[in-house]
Amino acid sequence: VAGAAVLRTTGGRAGTAQLGRDGIARIESEIVKLGSPQTTWFSARACTVPGPSGQSVLMTLQSIHGSDFFGPVQWTATADLGRTWSEPRPIPSLGRRRVDAEIEEGVCDVVPEYHAATKTVLAIGHNVFYRPKGFYRPQPPRWPVYAVRSPEGVWSEARRLPWDDPRGSNIYTCNCAQRSMLDNGHLLIPFSFGPQGRADRSVATAEVSFDGRELKILRMGPELRLNAGRGLLEPSLARFDGRYFLTLRAEDDRGYVTTSDDGLRWAPIRPWCWDDGEPLAMSTTQQRWLMHSDALRLVYTRKSAENAKVFRWRAPLYVAEVDRRQLRLIRSSERVAMALAGDAERHPKDVEQLGNFHTVAADPGQSWITVGAFAPSTFKGPLRISRVFWTRPNRG
C-alpha cells in the first residue's frame, strides 16, 4: 500500500473451518496484528476501493480504553486480501478537539463506503463527548460527522451532516449503519433520532445527495418507533432483488426487521423469528446484512445454551439465510460465523465481546466479518476477521 509501512498479519487460522452448505463453502477466522501489541482495536469496519492497480480493502478503526471510551479514528488498508496490512494512521479530522477545560469532543462508530460516482471514500460516524478519563454523562446533543478520502488518498476536514428537525434535538445519527447506493449516486441512509426529554429513539431512512465533498439530506421517510428502553437503534439497510430490508437493534430482548419497496416507506416492524415462528432472544446488539447475489443473510448474536452468562450474549456471532417472503431466519442454515473465545460458564467477563462488527464483500469469492474484540474485564482483545468463502461467485 503506497505511503505506508507494510505489516504481516496473523500466522495460522484461529478458527475451525466449517464445510459447505447453503452457498457457504467454509468459514475461517483469523487474528490480525496491527500496530502496537498493547493496542486493542474497536469498531473495525471495511470497504473495498477500486484502483488502477487493482482493488484494495480500506478499514477504519480506533483504540478502546474503557466503556464507550475510544481513541482517534484511524485507517489501514490491504491490497492482497488481508495477507498484509498498512500501518494504522490517524484520520486527522476525526480526532479529538477540546470543548472546554473538562470536555473533549471526538468521533466514533465510523463506517467507510466507496462512492463510485465521485471515486471517493465516505466515512460517516457521529460525535461523542469525553471527560479526561471516560465517557461524558449526560451527553450533549449528537449528530453525524463525516470525512471524505479523495481519489488521491487525502482525507478532508470533518463536516457535520445537518438536519434541522426538532425530532433530532437530542440526537440524530447513522452510527454503525449499513447504507445503500442509488443509481443516481444518491445514498439511502438509515437514521435513529430522538428529541430532548424522550428516552426512546425512532428510526427513518433518508435520501441523501453527495457531490464528493458534501452530504445533504433531501427527504426523510416516515418514522418507525418502539416504546421500550432507548427504542430502535443502529439500523442497517440492504437492497436485494429490487426490495429494501432494514434490521434494527432494540432493547426488549428482540431484534426487528422490516421491508420496503422504495427504501423510505417501511412496513410495520416485526421481531426476528425462526422460520417456524419462534422469536430469537437478542439483547440490545446490532445486526448486519451479509450480502451475496444468490441470497440475503444476517449476521447476529442471540441467546444460546453456551452464552447465557455472557454480557448481552455478544458471542458467538451467527449467520443465517433470510427467508425473504416470511422475513424470518432459516433455522437449518444457521452456523457460527465467529466462535466464542473464553470460558463462558466460569469466567463470562473474560469472554471476548463480538457485538460491534461489520461485513464487506472483499472479492467475488469471499466476504469478511470484521470485529474489534475485547473482554469486559480488561478491555483487551484481538482484531478478528472471519472469511466467508462462497461456493459460487458473488456477482455483487
Q: How should each PLM-predicted stretch be described?
A:
Residues 354-356, 363-368:
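Acidic, serine/threonine- and proline-rich intrinsically disordered appendage/tail regions
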Residues 15-40, 47-105, 114-172, 180-234, ...:
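Beta-rich carbohydrate-recognition and catalytic domains
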Residues 1-14:
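N-terminal export signals
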Residues 43-45, 109-111, 176-178, 234-236, ...:
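Conserved beta-strand position repeated once per blade in WD40 beta-propeller domains
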